Curated annotation (Swiss-Prot):
Compartments in which it is found: Cytoplasm; Cell projection, Growth cone
Phosphotyrosine, modified sites: 431, 499
Descriptive protein name: Dihydropyrimidinase-related protein 3
Short name of one Pfam family: Amidohydro_1
Function: Necessary for signaling by class 3 semaphorins and subsequent remodeling of the cytoskeleton. Plays a role in axon guidance, neuronal growth cone collapse and cell migration.
Sequence segments annotated as region (Disordered): 506-570
UniProt PTM: Phosphorylation on Ser-522 by DYRK2 promotes subsequent phosphorylation on Thr-509, Thr-514 and Ser-518 by GSK3.
The organism's place on the tree of life at top rank: Eukaryota
Record text on subunit structure and interactions: Homotetramer, and heterotetramer with CRMP1, DPYSL2, DPYSL4 or DPYSL5. Interacts with synaptic vesicle protein 2 and SH3A domain of intersectin. Interacts with FLNA.
One function term, GO molecular function aspect: identical protein binding
CC per GO annotation: cell body; cytosol; exocytic vesicle; extracellular space; filamentous actin; growth cone; lamellipodium; synapse
Residues recorded with modification Phosphothreonine: 509, 514, 543
Amino acid sequence: MSYQGKKNIPRITSDRLLIKGGRIVNDDQSFYADIYMEDGLIKQIGDNLIVPGGVKTIEANGKMVIPGGIDVHTHFQMPYKGMTTVDDFFQGTKAALAGGTTMIIDHVVPEPESSLTEAYEKWREWADGKSCCDYALHVDITHWNDSVKQEVQSLSKEKGVNSFMVYMAYKDLYQVSNTELYEIFTCLGELGAIAQVHAENGDIIAQEQARMLEMGITGPEGHVLSRPEELEAEAVFRAITVASQTNCPLYVTKVMSKSAADLISQARKKGNVVFGEPITASLGIDGTHYWSKNWAKAAAFVTSPPLSPDPTTPDYINSLLASGDLQLSGSAHCTFSTAQKAIGKDNFTAIPEGTNGVEERMSVIWDKAVATGKMDENQFVAVTSTNAAKIFNLYPRKGRIAVGSDSDLVIWDPDALKIVSAKNHQSVAEYNIFEGMELRGAPLVVICQGKIMLEDGNLHVTQGAGRFIPCSPFSDYVYKRIKARRKMADLHAVPRGMYDGPVFDLTTTPKGGTPAGSTRGSPTRPNPPVRNLHQSGFSLSGTQVDEGVRSASKRIVAPPGGRSNITSLS
């Protein structure tokens, strides 16, 4: 039965709001102007606005006013082996709002062999009842057959889903074959959807995991040792190749290594329609913590693909994000408690994977990229909000400050300093992988659906107030080039006359040989005759049938001086 939504879900009554004296920052321009909002929409932008009475005025005092962040990758309330991630849609979206994010896109992860549509309806019910901010959904394809293909078509055309993820890892669970990858990409390209991939070589990982365990390596360090970055890079290259062959846009989730990031950059320079999504963790921290003596701390960093042990990787990935080689950012927020992680205390392959990052995402990027001079304020808006809205066909409703856009806004203080700590973050998780980091840049005011959610350090959220935002297919930002290439790549057979020459008969059997059509041996030379040992004259009991018979094809050569009859060296 299709989930229709609870009748009593609270909805936000939008305030009439006026932001005065702010500097509006979009992805392509910055300018000073006032903003008037009503009914959850931006109604006016300019100076000396004429607004109705009873309007609440917020003084921006020259601070930046930016579009609310869009976190394109979360796992809230995700079931896993009888457990559930500790941050549900209420706690997760509350953390998002605290960090300046006003919309999330969560991943629906169906159990293998189960219905994608039923999983989608389950996620909708959970999110509609608990989400504090707007949300959309990706659907992960955890197996593939004709029935799943029909569900994908229905979800795309009728349910507001325009992105589907496939796994190239997790052998014998979610992993798809190369043939299935080709079929899925072909299907998604025809639907105008976006093909997302979790890029790792699952076959080799399975072998490496077994090797590590045989060596007695059972702790979290085994996770990164069994998943070297070459396995991420190989899968990224393979996915790019298949996407190119099927003319399907590709979206690589969780870009964690230099090698993977470089491949995406190179492919884009060659004209491939591919997008790369680094996450809060890969932008803000490295994988040296896997070798911590504190097992719980090391386990908190376990995620796949793993964080790179190379401490220069975060700076490198931030540089590619700033240059446009990578296009947007997610958090991959997927939090388990220490007790839940501890089911893998004796076997690293059993540690539930996932890290926090939804609350820290925007501050990490500001601190690592903008404050260091790699990225300007407009690029910051692009990689935290606008590019996501464009890719998933939400623009300009989301991701832009313009008349008619949703009133999802953030007053951002570039000079604010915040020390990250699990003691005061909004996540339920006991551990924060960014613990102790001092980050520059933070939200002062967060407005979602025209309602103030964060002000003066205090959150004012309403459980269940978030709306599902459907994502329609064929995003112009993604598909304009794809459509043009389809027209150019219209294939035709070469017109030629019928061949009327001789045709080799594959059923003919040459004398003394195997049939000409046999697949054994060389296709151009007949196989030599094989001796039938059952008809051999060889005997184990004495004289052979052919003994003493000189072969016509052999010469017998005696040494100089004749034959020797030496039987002893003494």
